[in-house]
Amino acid sequence: MAGLRARGGPGPGLLALSALGFCLMLQVSAKRPPKTPPCPPSCSCTRDTAFCVDSKAVPRNLPSEVISLTLVNAAFSEIQDGAFSHLPLLQFLLLNSNKFTLIGDNAFTGLSHLQYLFIENNDIWALSKFTFRGLKSLTHLSLANNNLQTLPRDIFRPLDILNDLDLRGNSLNCDCKVKWLVEWLAHTNTTVAPIYCASPPRFQEHKVQDLPLREFDCITTDFVLYQTLSFPAVSAEPFLYSSDLYLALAQPGVSACTILKWDYVERQLRDYDRIPAPSAVHCKPMVVDSQLYVVVAQLFGGSYIYHWDPNTTRFTRLQDIDPQRVRKPNDLEAFRIDGDWYFAVADSSKAGATSLYRWHQNGFYSHQALHPWHRDTDLEFVDGEGKPRLIVSSSSQAPVIYQWSRTQKQFVAQGEVTQVPDAQAVKHFRAGRDSYLCLSRYIGDSKILRWEGTRFSEVQALPSRGSLALQPFLVGGRRYLALGSDFSFTQIYQWDEGRQKFVRFQELAVQAPRAFCYMPAGDAQLLLAPSFKGQTLVYRHVVVDLSA
């Protein structure tokens, strides 16, 4: 029987010994202390919390189950991308009294369970636009008592379920950069404690929530370099022909009148054609009865009129301009009076006279000689109040105003602009019901004059030593004045309607400009600046929203 029991299984003694050994193992195991979770020296940790003081970086060696982290008096200045991504279960994060100055994009990426984020009493002066990206569970956010002066537009957009926001204790500058916040506060369902402006003075101590949006003037403009034409030029004239936009440039350096065509696809000016012109000072396009003509005024070698032949797609010389009448042209103006086309040439030679030509059937013919012996420099045609006028500026006397006589069909001298005896160029503009003249001077200040009914009166002087070119122009309701100089960069002024004066707006790096030309090209508003010494520059007028 004993042998049978041995083969069938353990006896009672062996079973008892096994039971005793198991009990001893349990006793030994019960006496071992629990395993200590990992924790950096600067932190105090439990299984799911960590409290860190004087850390030199975001602690890395933390329990993986941590759901609550507090950082106090941290010694690093920036929280970078993914700084807490190693703590994916984090639900509570307190960053208090640290030396942070900047929190970057995606700083809290990977914290999809974070519900409470308190960033308080730090030195933070800037947050990135995507600082809070990825915090889809965040319900409470505090940015109280930092040095924030502004907030990036739509910084709170990723926080879909945010319930409470605290921005108190910051130095918010309530300028255009904060306009979006005023709009957001008016429409959000998030509870936001009252916050106040620290600046500018007119808004100081005003509650941000109560600021009227109409007080924010945040739309401005800018002229940005759009295209560089790698050649000098002394005049620029845009024109439309057969529904296409072109530009005629006088380029004595390459002995040509260059015709450029606007490419509406590439949105650039492209080479199109050239007219031989060894000493061109002005290339004036005119479209008469659907035919294109270009008047080429030259200092030497005679001046000519070219006609565009659409059949041969080339320019052919149509007629010569009498060299005894036009000796040394300096400017050319084209205009229409009572249905007839004219162009006038300012002659700057000592023995020359500004001449008027009229289109008749198949050519331009001499119509009138104006202002002889005065070395004329510029012309400006003014058609206001039904009285066409031509203003002629001269280097030897005050600008002369001629008025068109419909009886004589000629210009008749009307008077002089005595305030500026040595104007190099003359331009005009209207603002409201008032008419103004702009006169540039090479030595002395350029002048802005207003017509008072019987005479001109000076309203403004603009510093302009070395100026040979100026041009007022209107873009989308905004009036500007481009004023060039041979000794400094070009100044752009903007018209202040309240003060009825031009105020300095922008400086453009144009060397020795000889003209300025405004050219709308589709939705692009362009300002061309032909340069005598350098490249011809094309600037684009852009509208800038400072609140964006």
From Swiss-Prot:
Pfam name, any one: LRR_8
Glycoprotein in keyword set: yes
Tagged with keyword Glycoprotein: yes
Domain LRRNT: 31-64
Compartments in which it is found: Secreted; Cytoplasmic vesicle, Secretory vesicle, Synaptic vesicle; Synapse, Synaptosome
Keywords associated with the record: Cytoplasmic vesicle, Exocytosis, Glycoprotein, Leucine-rich repeat, Repeat, Secreted, Signal, Synapse, Synaptosome
Glycosylated sites: 189, 311
GO CC annotation terms, alphabetical: extracellular space; juxtaparanode region of axon; synaptic vesicle
EAR repeat start and end residues: 222-264, 268-310, 314-361, 363-406, 410-453, 455-497, 501-543
Location of the LRRCT domain: 170-220
InterPro entries according to UniProt: Cys-rich_flank_reg_C, EAR, EPTP, Leu-rich_rpt, Leu-rich_rpt_typical-subtyp, LGI_related, LRR_dom_sf, Quinoprot_gluc/sorb_DH_b-prop
Main location: secreted
A Gene Ontology biological process term: regulation of exocytosis
Assembly description: Interacts with STX1A.
Role this protein plays: May participate in the regulation of neuronal exocytosis.
Record-given protein name: Leucine-rich repeat LGI family member 3
Organism: Pan troglodytes (Chimpanzee)
